């Protein structure tokens, strides 16, 4: 059974945060991966174990043409990898800040390495709140709305909001694994995000 999951990502392209004062709900885990990557199963196992443990992560699997197939990667996901300059698979970007390259086969797991990153980030507060909702419009058309409010001080420049639409429980055998999870199907509105420079922004898109 396939399951659609929504993740909202506030991405700081430049600058840093200060006077952060709102507890975060989760840690963003962008994993650059592919079904043809022999070392990527350990990354997938690490993410699965963290979710099973109930840890507050937002996994976003970014498949690219480097190690995946056209049914999993898009021009947007390739662009996302180029943005970070990804050269090794798998590579984890935690909150867009911490980086861990490397993995293993289907009998191995990156859990301990990823958990260490989670522990570093989960208590880092944020100057933003994000509320996400979605509704069915008609037929197979949905509308997603993200409301971002600035509640603290932030000295970052070029701040952007991006919504990642992911799909999980795709029945596909790959590198000894039974299914593919958190596959990025769309970056809304695009991989460039929506510029945010004021106190509040509402992003509404249909897909």
Feature-to-residue mapping (PLM):
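Bacterial Sec-dependent N-terminal signal peptides
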Residues: 1-24
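Local sequence-structure signature of Cys/Sec-based thiol-disulfide redox active-site neighborhoods
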Residues: 20-62
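Short, conserved sequence motifs used for protein processing/export or organelle targeting and
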Residues: 45, 55-207
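Short, proline-centered helix/strand-breaking motifs
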Residues: 15, 26-29, 90
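Residue-level signal for pocket-adjacent positions within structured domains
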Residues: 12, 32, 183
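The N-terminal extracellular segments of secreted preproproteins, especially immediately downstream
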Residues: 11-13, 36-39, 141, 153
